[in-house]
Amino acid sequence: MQIWRQLAATGVALLLLGYYPLAQAAPAAKLWDRWNAFNPASSATIDHRPWHNWLETFVVSGADGINRVAYNQITEADRARLRTYIDSLTALSISDFKRNQQRAYWINLYNALTIDIVLEHFPLNSIRDISRGLFSSGPWRLKLATIEGEALTLDDIE
């Protein structure tokens, strides 16, 4: 009977540990008051054409209908273009824009940073292979960008 209890306890522990990476990959959304600032009167727009052009070059549709980034075709010059786009976004004072501009900004910044971190570690089988340590899976908690003086992770942006 003792052996069955130990096996059951071990099974439960392994099951719970198996969910740990999933909990990290999908954190609970929490909005920071810091990012509630916006300018409803702003007529300024953010130029995402460099990102659009970059994606048009490197995103391919698979036979299964899923779009994928052709990481193996990206050169150092192409990555430099991506970094230039990211740098142009991080240089902006995002609080000065309307909400719709902010939304596009955060979505595009998140995606560009994600591709950039994959390129930094390429080749790899999964983004989860990018790790900060034993109990981390993926780059979501790495400080990847500084916006208005605030160092942010992909989790923060999400």
Predicted regions and their residues:
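Bacterial N-terminal signal peptides that target proteins for export
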Residues: M1-G11
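Bacterial N-terminal signal peptides
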Residues: T10-Y19
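Sec/Tat signal peptide C-region and signal peptidase I cleavage site
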Residues: P21-A25
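Interaction/scaffold regions that mediate signaling and macromolecular assembly across diverse proteins
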Residues: A26-E158
